[in-house]
């Protein structure tokens, strides 16, 4: 079993962040030939024996700032970040990363159903155009996103006229944090950014020695290739987002 665990860690550089739960789920998903999969406690013990220790988490700070005078939308999520179907309830946010030649702002839309990244955009500024581009990319990739709920904080980018017009154009139902900007009101997005930085950046890359373009390539590959398709997600019962999504649509075909 130790060899199977090491094989899992070697498949992707970010797999070394797996704790006992995700390692157990990865073993269950892959079912290595000739390997008996024991309980989580045994998995944890073996991980300790072979030096696969999970790194501690760090909490990133939010970067958007609320505009108290701007248009607001109701909180349609109310901290319920679950969804029974894809493309019905989503969250969006942005984060900041320091590079050698400036700052890179990363904006994404996550699906509450399986935590898939539906839209991703990056730029050296955090203006509303970045959020608009993220939404454009998401709808282009997933036209059925029209009519879904899209939740954000009350940052000036999300209360801007430009973003509001994009929301209307695509028939999206805009949702925002409740008055007062409580941190838990957009906890899903903040959690995703924390996981991204913990797995890809902290202790692995010195981003201040990398250019913006190098970071863009690294982040695109992480989210679109690894996060969506290969990363074990405990919230999905150990399934990568796109695997859970494929199973959902397959079940619809079987029921038809």
Could you say what each language-model-derived stretch is?
Residues 98, 102, 120-144, 159:
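Active-site beta-loop-alpha junctions of metal-dependent nucleic acid enzymes
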Residues 168, 194-256:
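C-terminal domain-tail junction helix/linker
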Residues 1-85, 183, 240-250:
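Basic, flexible linker segments flanking DNA-binding modules
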Residues 53, 172-173:
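Residue-level detector of anion-binding/catalytic polar loops
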Residues 63-66, 152-154, 160-163, 176-199, ...:
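RNase H-like two-metal-ion nuclease catalytic core shared by retroviral integrases
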Residues 79-118, 124-128:
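An active-site-proximal beta-strand-loop segment
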Residues 5, 23, 43, 47, ...:
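Mobile genetic element proteins and their domesticated derivatives, centered on retroelements
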């Amino acid at each position: 079993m130790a060899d199977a665990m090491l094989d899992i860690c070697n498949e992707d550089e970010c797999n070394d962040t797996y704790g006992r739960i995700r390692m157990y789920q990865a073993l269950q998903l892959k079912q290595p030939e000739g390997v008996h999969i024991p309980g989580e406690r045994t998995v944890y013990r073996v991980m300790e024996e072979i030096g696969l220790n999970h790194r501690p988490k760090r909490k990133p700070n939010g970067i958007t700032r609320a505009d108290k005078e701007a248009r607001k939308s109701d909180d349609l999520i109310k901290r319920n970040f679950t969804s029974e179907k894809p493309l019905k309830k989503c969250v969006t946010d942005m984060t900041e990363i320091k590079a050698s030649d400036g700052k890179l702002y990363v904006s994404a839309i996550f699906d509450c159903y399986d935590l898939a990244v539906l839209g991703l955009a990056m730029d050296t500024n955090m203006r509303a155009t970045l959020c608009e581009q993220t939404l454009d990319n998401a709808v282009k990739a997933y036209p059925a996103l029209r009519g879904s709920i899209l939740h954000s904080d009350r940052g000036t980018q999300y209360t801007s006229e430009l973003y509001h017009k994009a929301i209307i154009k695509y028939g999206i139902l805009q949702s925002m944090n409740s008055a007062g900007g409580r941190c838990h009101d957009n906890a899903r997005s903040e959690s995703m950014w924390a996981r991204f930085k913990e797995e890809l950046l902290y202790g692995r890359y010195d981003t201040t020695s990398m250019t913006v373009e190098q970071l863009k390539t690294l982040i695109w590959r992480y989210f679109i290739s690894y996060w969506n398709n290969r990363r074990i997600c405990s919230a999905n019962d150990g399934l990568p987002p796109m695997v859970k999504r494929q199973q959902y649509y397959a079940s619809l075909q079987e029921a038809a």
